[in-house]
Amino acid sequence: MVEMNKRGQFFIIGGVILSIGLILFFLLGFNSYTSDGSYLTVFKMKDVKNSIESCLINSLTSNSNLSKNLDMLKNNYKDEGIEINYKKIIFSNIRYEAKNLTFNFSLYNGNFSYNISNYGFGGAFNGSLNVSNYVFSKNLLLNISENGSVTGSFNITGSYVNVFVYDRFGNLILNETIYNNSNEKSLYYYILNVSKEGILLYLLWQRMFLTTHWQKMYPL
């Protein structure tokens, strides 16, 4: 009888310890992914994402303190009840490719000339150049090394050309119309989210956020 009571007490104590362990497990699991929820909130809200991107661009072009600018932005949104977790942004797989490009285009007596330089930072620029009008069209691939430039010229038909420059993902980054006997110079600071995982990462993390803690730690 005494032995049965001891066994009963053992099972009761064991059950209590197990219950406490499970409660702590789920509480810690929830808390460890709270920051992921903030991360999702940031990238789900377009205006906040655009504000962060503008902050990155302004800090780059003005050579100002990025951390200080991010903290100011964070405090501004905090007043509106939006919490931004910069640690997740800085150490995530979302990277930014910075370019400092200069475009020179000219059209004289039917001859179109171009000079595109890539100086300052960000590695090589890869993309394409399209020059066209209602009777003429020409496409060129661009591969401009860092601190390098490309130059070329060719004859066109017509009194003007539309010039389009695309990045390596097909995004239009420059659109100019050059008329005969004129030239155009454009300075361009260019920052691109090159990971293309911005959306993919968001969807993946959202899926993981909605699954169980066990699946997060040990995905099938």
UniProtKB/Swiss-Prot annotation:
Annotated protein name in UniProt: Uncharacterized protein MJ1283
Organism: Methanocaldococcus jannaschii (strain ATCC 43067 / DSM 2661 / JAL-1 / JCM 10045 / NBRC 100440)
Source superkingdom: Archaea
Keywords: Membrane, Transmembrane, Transmembrane helix
Membrane topology classification: Single-pass membrane protein
Gene Ontology cellular component annotations, sorted alphabetically: membrane
Transmembrane segments: 10-30
Subcellular location: Membrane
Main location: membrane
